[in-house]
Curated annotation (Swiss-Prot):
The N-terminal domain contains the ATP/Pi binding site, the central domain the pyrophosphate/phosphate carrier histidine, and the C-terminal domain the pyruvate binding site. It catalyses: pyruvate + phosphate + ATP = phosphoenolpyruvate + AMP + diphosphate + H(+). Phosphorylation of Thr-530 in the dark inactivates the enzyme. Dephosphorylation upon light stimulation reactivates the enzyme. The active site is at residues 532, 910. The modification Phosphothreonine is found at residue 530. Homodimer. InterPro entries: ATP_grasp_subdomain_1, PEP-util_enz_mobile_dom, PEP_util_AS, PEP_util_C, PEP_util_CS, Phosphohistidine_dom_sf, PPDK_AMP/ATP-bd, Pyruvate_phosphate_dikinase. It is found in: Plastid, Chloroplast. Formation of phosphoenolpyruvate, which is the primary acceptor of CO(2) in C4 and some Crassulacean acid metabolism plants. Activated by light-induced dephosphorylation. Inhibited by dark-induced phosphorylation. Both reactions are catalyzed by PDRP1. Its cofactor is Mg(2+). The gene is PPD. It holds the Pfam family PEP-utilizers. This is Pyruvate, phosphate dikinase, chloroplastic.
């Protein structure tokens, strides 16, 4: 210890005076060891060091001996990284270690931009802090003090020195931007002595205004004192002085504010404001680290599925001031317009202000052109810096800057947030300007950006926040404004009268599809992200908010109850399908903004991607919409949806269901055949030259029966079928199932009622031959649902091929076709090699496969899923985002086993996961040939598939 202490004296700067050396020599060795764990602060507090030459104080701090035993971590791993103009110990590629803010500050410094000198404490240091009892280790504190000495040397000013005061800003900065972390602390290092020195140099009003801001910020952010506690004191003083604005307070007034603010610490915390600048810095750093585990931060990470981060970094920089008169100012800007993508600086600027003044809205900011006229040199440098940063980062940048007495300082840069329209234009323009290639441009647009372009959006979401009455699940994106209606029939009737309606139901059923189609938006009290309402609405591109448990739907009285509000039929509601918000009244809408840039951008995505993108479509209209959105075929056509297209069809289906004998059933099926054939012809025509995959009847038969109690159902079926009531009772009893989704459905229907499969196959082949004879290129693919054994599929394939031969013989025409199956039962995935002997293609039905693998009912999962997500038991809704570890492994296994038996096997997926970006990436990496999703998600899937390459 003695030799180490001697080293301090040997390494002291040449201007260390003899008096200082003597003072240090008197230090008690034992006392030094005792206090070393707190960074030498009790021996040479900065308040004492001010008596000596400031460089000596800084030098002593940096060389203070730390007791190794008190630090369980090793300083071999660098944890503090400094930066300043033209030099940096970090770079933009170190975001995981330095956080986004720290990495970008280091990068700006290294390329020669004017960045206030500073240091970044790494995310690994935060991790160590959390793991070691939330204490700053002696070794880390020593590194911080060494970094602080570098800042002091750069600036020629010193923390705690009244004659040359150095003030600091302290900010958090995780690798991913996370609102909910700690707010900024500015002007750290001020106390009664330092503020007097600052006042002598820069004027009393500036100094004491900075001091009162610091007391407020530090108290709120670091000490946990409510901002209102300070604000109350300020407001009372302004009233007493007869002024309204902070800027009207005199220096004398501000001194009074400072004293009152210091009293707040005593009143609220029972302790004095910590005047020691080192202590202030320690507490601020600890507050940033502690904020990583704050409830708000944890909740934010859970909601946004942010995992795998070590913690937050801490950025400490010397303060620069925009509030030092009319040659100073502060601003924020985007290097291009974030809303439109226009290549023009877009931002705001305030003369004689600090950064928080822009954000707080105390003063109205001015356009950047103001800066051009009043600070031409600084503005010119700013424009040059913007061009440098865009070309360096190859992106549109969000920049914060300050001008202090005509000198420009760059405070922060990051990739700028942008709208969908802005994102596409910026990506296209950057390619045209030669800054990025098309591969890079494709990755600059998020799939959610396309959602904005393909659905109507609210013009200004911030304008309606006070009218949000409930929040459900954002089941289908976009926005809808309409009058509420409580029945599907009424929705169709009102829509026929030219009214915009929102269908409100407890939950929807297949029988509601007419009203759902007529409605501009759908709101349900029950159901999840893959409920009937969500799936159907998503397929049509309609706005839907599902599972809104805050509302109570009273169909009888035709009212919607939310808390103490009663909303009646015909009242106006607005829905935000992207956020799940339910808003009272009308909110202005913006139509979808399709443009030439979007077409250009999507053509690049198509050139790059390997995975094909098809669509789920059940009608000719759906098929045409899918094709217009770039679909390369139909991956799923659900024949059961055609049965609900008219009253005649559904009544005929019910006759088929009620039939007791195969002869009776065949009569009803013969009546259905023309309907099915006509629909298939329309779809084949719309998809001329592209494959169409048609799934045979899948849902349980009870779904086609009327809703209501048994007496109502029997009464209605008696009228429709002419059967006696006791016969209908008997038939309904036989159809009744305890668990219909695992019961009499899928291929089990076709095996039990072969005539059903034969009718559907005949309709498909007759339609295909008819269209082919009219010059339409037809590629039908028939898909057998819910297969679990090769024998089930073999039975159905034999029936289908026999019907094909009969139709070809009857018409004298033939064509190529495929027969395959849906893999949606876990057993089918495990024996996929055997099933592939009968199947020419596999299509994974990930909705049912997820349901059966997890053992979750899609219709009931909403009761516990929110709890699972909030507790971190699940990271995401498995019906929305593919479970890659479980369901995904079954898909991989089935694909490998299937192709081992049939190398030419075509493999795809037709569940709702086909339009979810991270799931699409998995399917591409797993070697699937295609994904199929709703028509309105086709562009998103096209982009996601390209981003994988």
């Amino acid at each position: 210890m003695a030799s180490a202490f001697k080293g301090i004296l040997i390494r002291s700067p040449p201007d260390v005076c003899a008096e200082t050396v003597a003072k240090v020599s008197q230090c008690n060795r034992a006392q030094l060891v005792k206090n070393s764990s707190t960074g030498f602060k009790n021996i040479f507090k900065l308040s004492e060091a001010r008596k000596f030459h400031a460089p000596v104080a800084s030098h002593l701090r940096s060389q203070a001996v730390m007791a190794p035993a008190s630090d369980p971590t090793s300083t071999a791993i660098k944890r503090v990284f400094t930066f300043g103009k033209g030099r940096s110990e970090g770079n933009k590629g170190m975001k995981s270690l330095l956080g986004g803010k720290g990495a970008n500050l280091a990068e700006m410094a290294s390329i020669g931009l004017s960045v206030p000198p500073g240091l970044t404490i790494s995310t690994e240091a935060c991790q160590e802090y959390q793991e070691h009892g939330k204490q700053l280790s002696a070794g880390l504190w020593e590194e911080i003090l060494e970094g602080l000495r570098v800042i002091e040397k750069d600036m020629g000013s010193y923390l705690g020195d009244p004659s040359k005061p150095l003030l600091l800003s302290v900010r958090s900065g995780a690798a991913i931007s996370m609102p909910g972390m700690m707010d900024t602390v500015l002007n750290l290092g001020l106390n009664d002595d330092v503020v007097a020195g600052l006042a002598a140099k820069s004027g009393e009003r500036f100094a004491y205004d900075s001091y009162r801001r610091f007391l407020d910020m530090f108290g709120n952010v670091v000490m946990g004192i409510s901002h209102s506690s300070f604000e109350e004191k300020l407001e009372k003083l302004k009233q007493a002085k007869g002024v309204k604005l902070d800027t009207e307070l005199t220096a004398s007034d501000l001194k009074e504010v400072v004293e009152q603010y210091k009293n707040v610490y005593l009143e609220v915390k029972g302790e004095k404001f910590p005047a020691d600048p080192e202590r202030q810095l320690q507490l601020a750093i600890q507050a940033v680290f502690d904020s990583w585990d704050s409830p708000r931060a944890i909740k934010y990470r859970n909601i946004n599925q942010i995992t795998g981060l070590k913690g937050t970094a801490v950025n400490i920089q010397c303060m620069v001031f925009g509030n030092m008169g009319n040659t100073s100012g502060t601003g924020v800007l985007f290097t291009r317009n974030p809303s439109t993508g226009e290549k023009k600086l877009y931002g705001e600027f305030l003369i004689n202000a600090q950064g928080e003044d822009v954000v707080a809205g105390i003063r109205t900011p001015e356009d950047l052109d103001t800066m051009r006229s009043c600070m031409p040199e600084a503005y010119k440098e700013l424009v040059e810096n913007c061009e440098i940063l865009e070309r360096h980062y190859k992106d549109m940048m969000d920049i914060e800057f300050t001008v202090q007495e005509n000198r420009l300082w760059m405070l922060q840069c990051r990739s700028g947030k942008r709208t969908g329209k802005g994102a596409v234009k910026i990506a296209v323009d950057l390619v045209k300007e030669g800054i990025v290639d098309t591969y890079t441009a494709i990755k600059m647009v998020e799939p959610q950006h396309l959602d904005q372009l393909l659905h109507p959006q609210f013009e200004d979401p911030s304008a309606y926040k006070d009218r949000v009455i409930a929040t459900g699940l954002p089941a289908s994106p976009g926005a809808a404004v309409g009058q509420i209606i409580f029945s599907a029939d009424e929705a169709e009737s009102w829509q026929a009268q030219g009214k915009s309606v929102i269908l409100v139901r407890n939950e929807t059923s297949p029988e509601d599809v007419g009203g759902m189609h007529a409605a501009i938006g759908i709101l349900t009290a029950r159901g999840g992200m893959t409920s009937h309402a969500a799936v159907v609405a998503g397929g049509w591109g309609k706005c839907c908010v599902s599972g809104c448990s805050e509302i109570r739907v009273n169909d009888t009285d035709k009212v919607l109850l939310v808390g103490d509000k009663v909303i009646s039929e015909g009242d106006w509601l607005s829905l935000n399908g992207s956020t799940g918000e339910v808003i009272l009244g009308k909110v202005p809408l913006s139509p979808p903004a399709l443009s030439g840039d979007l077409e250009t951008f999507m053509s690049w995505a198509d050139d790059i991607r390997v995975l094909k993108v098809m669509a789920n479509a059940d009608t000719p209209e759906d098929a045409l919409a899918a094709r217009n959105n770039g679909a390369e075929g139909i991956g799923l056509c659900r024949t059961e949806h055609m049965f609900f297209a008219s009253d005649d069809r559904i009544k005929t289906v019910r006759k088929m269901i009620m039939a007791v004998t195969s002869e009776q059933r065949k009569v009803a099926l013969d009546q259905l055949l023309p309907y099915q054939r006509s629909d298939f012809e329309g779809i084949f025509r719309a998809m001329d030259g592209l494959p169409v995959t048609i799934r045979l009847l899948d849902p349980p038969l009870h779904e086609f029966l009327p809703e209501g109690d048994v007496e109502q159902i029997v009464s209605e079926l008696t009228l429709e079928t002419g059967m006696a009531e006791d016969e209908i009772f008997s038939r309904i009893e036989k159809l009744s199932e305890v668990n219909p989704m695992l019961g009499f459905r899928g291929c089990r229907l076709g095996i039990s009622y072969p005539e059903l499969t034969e009718m559907q196959a005949r309709a498909i082949f007759q339609a295909a031959v008819s269209m082919s004879n009219q010059g339409v290129k037809v590629f039908p693919e028939i898909m057998v649902p819910l297969v679990g054994t090769p024998q089930e599929l073999g039975h159905q394939v034999s029936l289908i091929r026999n019907v094909a031969e009969k139709v070809f013989s009857e018409t004298g025409s033939s064509l190529s076709y495929k027969v395959g199956t849906m893999i949606e039962i876990p057993r089918a995935a495990l024996v996929a090699d055997e099933i592939a002997m009968e199947a020419e293609f596999f299509s994974f039905g990930t909705n049912d496969l997820t349901q059966m693998t997890f053992g979750y009912s899609r219709d009931d999962v909403g009761k516990f899923l929110p709890v699972y997500l909030s507790k971190g038991i699940l990271q995401s809704d498995p019906f929305e985002v593919l479970d890659q570890k479980g369901v995904g492994q079954l898909i991989k296994l089935a694909t490998e086993k299937g192709r081992s038996a049939r190398p030419s096997l075509k493999v795809g997926i037709c569940g709702e996961h086909g339009g979810e970006p991270s799931s699409v990436a998995f399917f591409a990496e797993a070697g699937l040939d295609y994904v199929s999703c709703s028509p309105f998600r086709v562009p998103i899937a096209r982009l996601a598939a390209a981003q994988v390459v």
